[in-house]
């Protein structure tokens, strides 16, 4: 049975979701990992497969190859800017974003970048496009900062997203996570999204929960995984139960099946 909860995105509601998170979480064992690997191996692929919650929410629709856009870059730059502010309280959000942008451009000028990296992409933009990227990053930082300011429990910005390579299945999983809250024995993860949630946002949240647990060396799931849509004023949450972990894993495998069928039809 799913533990999906739907709430208005208010400071009080978010803090209540954090405080009421279960004290006991489920744990994924080596047997669970082996079972997931076998399921993915049964879905043949000619190339390395990369899956995340967004693909699950899009029902496995074909996607374009990755390329940087201001909307994608804003999360990386905006979060890095917030880390700067945590160490230097005298910085404003806009100044922190500009400093982060300048560091990337300096890295490219010094020749320390590779083709396809964020720094490489930024170095090829016009001044107008760089201004757009900066504005998007400031917006992301401001929105995230407002969420952080309302939290009543100790928090930290996630060091990275969760990544898990499925053994012998040519499949990589990526789970988004933005804020980690550790409260006694609880670990609550917050994921921020722009726009508004759709009908498949719950399954997407369960996928991020499952990938986060798979990426953990101990396999222990977060007590609660909270998705926040500040623009829409909505937040959803799922608990780290075995039922939700299995549901998230099943949805990832289903997405791989849908993608395989699409590739077969395209090749026919």
Q: Which residue ranges define each predicted feature?
A:
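Structural preference for long, well-ordered alpha-helical segments in enzyme cores
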Residues: 144, 208-212
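Charged, glycine-rich intrinsically disordered N-terminal tails and low-complexity linkers that flank
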Residues: 1-108
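Non-catalytic protein-protein interaction segments used by genome-maintenance enzymes to assemble
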Residues: 161-208
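Active-site catalytic microenvironments for nucleophilic, acid-base chemistry
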Residues: 79, 84, 211-217
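Short amphipathic C-terminal alpha-helix that caps PH/PH-like domains
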Residues: 100, 105, 205-209, 249-260
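A non-catalytic, helix-rich entry segment at domain boundaries
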Residues: 80-160
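Short acidic (Asp/Glu) and glycine-rich catalytic loops that position anionic groups and cofactors
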Residues: 52, 56, 81, 185-192, ...
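Metal-dependent nuclease catalytic regions and adjoining charged, substrate-binding loops involved
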Residues: 214-268
